[in-house]
């Protein structure tokens, strides 16, 4: 069956790498994990994850996509497919693999052949009207995250407006607010992973 693959997408600076770092730190004692980062010309995100996170360096793969980073997660996923295959061969016990996209726009989505679930993260500093634009990444993701809530007073963003707009386009699909710098709201993300992704409720029944 193989490990479950979770795609993590969002604009540059929204908190994708930090999200993966926080999730893996919280779940390290209960789940076997690895991570793949995509960027156009560097593997900087992979280096940051290795330096700041808890995953061993050999469980982190950095991909230099060249050109458009969206292509590597949607139209031509071959580099990511190869990285996943390599990780599974080296670590047969893997249960979760995170695939972080390069900084992308609001319309970027993951190929359903590449990932089983997807998270799309934005940050408050981009403005309260961002959820209203309802890009495909925000609409189609399995979990939508509005990050950096602590910045709202400084950028004039109304969190209540963002929440109402998110409710409108998400319908019944989950979303949450976070401040990953302090782990505020991380519990909601972990709950989603444990119950919706790992389906621990069924395993414990």
UniProtKB/Swiss-Prot annotation:
Subcellular location(s) of the protein: Cytoplasm
Pfam families in the record: cobW (PF02492)
GO biological process, one term: urea catabolic process
Domain of life: Bacteria
Major subcellular site: cytoplasm
Keyword field: Chaperone, Cytoplasm, GTP-binding, Nickel insertion, Nucleotide-binding
Function: Facilitates the functional incorporation of the urease nickel metallocenter. This process requires GTP hydrolysis, probably effectuated by UreG.
Subunit structure: Homodimer. UreD, UreF and UreG form a complex that acts as a GTP-hydrolysis-dependent molecular chaperone, activating the urease apoprotein by helping to assemble the nickel containing metallocenter of UreC. The UreE protein probably delivers the nickel.
Name of the protein in its database record: Urease accessory protein UreG
Encoding gene per record: ureG
């Amino acid at each position: 069956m193989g490990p479950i693959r979770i795609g993590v997408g969002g604009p540059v600076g929204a908190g994708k790498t930090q999200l993966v770092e926080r999730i893996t730190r919280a779940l390290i004692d209960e789940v076997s994990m690895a991570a793949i980062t995509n960027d156009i010309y560097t593997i900087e995100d992979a280096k940051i994850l290795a330096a700041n996170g808890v995953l061993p360096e050999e469980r982190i793969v950095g991909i230099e996509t060249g050109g458009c980073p969206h292509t590597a997660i949607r139209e031509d996923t071959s580099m990511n497919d190869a990285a996943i295959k390599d990780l599974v061969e080296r670590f047969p016990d893997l249960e979760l693999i995170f695939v972080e996209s390069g900084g992308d726009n609001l319309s970027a989505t993951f190929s359903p052949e590449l990932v089983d679930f997807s998270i799309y993260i934005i940050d408050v500093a981009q403005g309260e009207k961002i959820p209203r634009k309802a890009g495909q990444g925000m609409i189609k993701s399995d979990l939508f995250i509005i990050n950096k809530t602590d910045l709202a007073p400084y950028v004039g963003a109304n969190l209540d407006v963002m929440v109402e707009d998110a409710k409108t386009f998400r319908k019944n699909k989950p979303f949450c607010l976070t401040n990953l710098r302090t782990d505020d709201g991380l519990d909601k993300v972990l709950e989603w992973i444990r119950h919706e992704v790992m389906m621990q409720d069924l395993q414990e029944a």
